[in-house]
């Protein structure tokens, strides 16, 4: 059986984004994160953020950067060991 691209690769940083979102004080909801991103000109709704965190949606580089800024963490915190 031939593997599809979807089966071979996945978004590896989604769970780390979720961890960073929930570590904020107070924790940031997906809706709140969507609002913070919209204020920065990046339009991801709650559903898109959920898909990112569950590793079913890929991210663009500018989205990773905007999410890090919105959560006040470094981009590097999304990479490496959890």
Where are these regions (language model features)?
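A short, Lys/Arg-rich alpha-helix, primarily the initiator
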Residues: 1-26, 76
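Phosphate-coordinating loops and pocket residues in cytosolic domains that bind phosphorylated ligands
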Residues: 51, 80-81
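Generic non-transmembrane alpha-helical segments
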Residues: 16, 20, 36-40, 70
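Short alpha-helical elements of helix-turn-helix
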Residues: 15, 31, 47, 61-64
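Short alpha-helical DNA-recognition segment
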Residues: 26-51
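The DNA-recognition helices of helix-turn-helix-type DNA-binding domains
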Residues: 40, 56, 81-82
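DNA major-groove recognition helix of helix-turn-helix/homeodomain DNA-binding modules
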Residues: 36, 56, 60-77
């Amino acid at each position: 059986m031939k593997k599809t691209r979807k089966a071979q690769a996945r978004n590896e940083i989604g769970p780390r984004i979720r961890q960073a979102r929930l570590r904020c004080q107070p924790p940031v909801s997906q809706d709140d994160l969507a609002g913070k991103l919209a204020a920065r000109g990046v339009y991801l709704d709650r559903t898109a953020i959920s898909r990112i965190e569950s590793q079913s949606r890929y991210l663009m580089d500018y989205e990773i950067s905007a999410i890090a800024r919105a959560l006040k963490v470094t981009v590097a915190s999304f990479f490496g060991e959890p």
